[in-house]
Amino acid sequence: MTTPSDDFPESPRPVQPTLPPNLSGAPDSVALGSTLTTADSAFSAAPTSAVSAQSPQKVRVRGKLLKLMLSMSVANLAIFSIWGAVPGILLPLQVEGIVGDGAKAGTLAIVATIGAFAAMVAQPIAGMVSDRTRSRFGRRAPWMVAGVLIGGLALLGMAAANTIVQIAIAWVIVQIAYNFAQGPLSAILPDRVPSAVRGTFAALSGLGLMLGALGGQIAGAAFASSIPTGYLVFAGLALLVIVLFVVLNPDKSNRGEPKPPFNLVAFLKTFWVSPVKHPDFFWGFTGRLLLFAGYFMVTGYQLYILQDYIGLKGGAVAMVPVLGILSLGGTLISTLIGGPLSDKLGRRKIVVIIAGGILAASLVFPLVMPTVTGMMIFAFVSGLGFGAYQSVDTALMSEVLPSKDDFAKDLGVLNIAATLPQTLAPGIAGAIVVAFGQVYTPLFPIGIVIALLGAVAVLPIKSVR
């Protein structure tokens, strides 16, 4: 469909991404518009091309790659605004409006759990299917567009739903569809981005993710009195942005490439990556799962926390945007610093460990200060921690992928660790609250332990410093 980027010569064959020289030797800083030389910095627009590890080539971080970096950040923002607005604001309010205050926690836990398991199954399937896809538009774009289109229709179904069963069915379709968009989108990083600049790339991509997740909560609160309109707006935004992303960053046609025959055993293995054969992948998955869970277990449930734990009741919705802005402030600071700093130092793991410690510390404030002030401090400090983690997360994950031929499938498995905690957070939190007799206090010490475990989980990773 298009020719390879003029700025990034096409690599002769796909190879396993490897650590760039600046991750194993003297650190090099990478700035937008700069030029670097690295053994694996060849860039190709071909959908099956990974980052080359052949002879050193100059890579200019500008032109098509810069456009890809910026537009992928916006694409993440659009999709994750749905994950911020719907399970964090719109869905809890819709459930509360149907079942009432007394049954809202348990009911939301059930709906969230069902949807989360749908997401868990959809992610690796989406990756595997996109890896096998042959089309004039490449292997990622068709599924990204189809995902946001079907997901948008499902959100309209949620807007029209007036029973819990209808909501649950529509929410399952939303989870599956948007994960079919999100999985192939995330696979673009190892497909088309040089390893040496993945930290900076991941920082911008992670910034879009966080702006979407937190901005979605802020915007979602604005639709508290008109939930169906909110669903319509977020569905339209995702559709528009993803279509523009595909148009602005086209892949070459891959219709002439061989497609392996479908194998049921191989398909079932999609859901399993051996921790014995690929321990770095296992620890990367575990760290991401725990850090996301520790963060979203409180952030994703903060509407009910504000209502019942802080005691704001009707004023809780108005406080959500305030907390979102504070969290965004912390996120902006740490994200814009963390990724480039990681590239400069040539280290990822230390940033993850620091981020996990900050996240754990943030949860202390609402525990000892069950007030609006305590929640405001939590919002800013947790934004610092999670933003720091997001700034290096994608880069770190891309370095532990076990196979050069199954980028999207493996990233689909890894994305379970991000999507599952975020969508399941209301369910986990609701189950804890119900188990302790409608008491919210245990959420915070449990979150602290989970965040700390997530931080230290990256220590055994050997392929990344």
What does each of the following model-derived ranges do?
Residues P14, D40-L66, K252-T286:
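Juxtamembrane intracellular "pre-TM" segments in multi-pass secondary transporters
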Residues Q54-A116, F282-L312:
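Helix-loop boundary and gating motifs at the non-cytosolic
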Residues A109-S130, V322-I337:
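Central cavity-lining transmembrane alpha-helices of secondary-active solute carriers
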Residues A118-M120, G199-A221, N415-P426:
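Glycine-rich segments within core transmembrane alpha-helices of 12-TM secondary carriers
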Residues A122-F137, S334-R347, V433:
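Helix-to-loop junctions at the C-terminal end of transmembrane segments
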Residues R139-A141, A222-L237, A429-A451:
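A membrane-interface helix-boundary motif in multi-pass transporters
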Residues R140-L156, I350-F365:
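Structural signature of the two symmetry-related core transmembrane helices
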Residues V241-N249, P445-R465:
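Multi-pass alpha-helical transporter architecture, strongest
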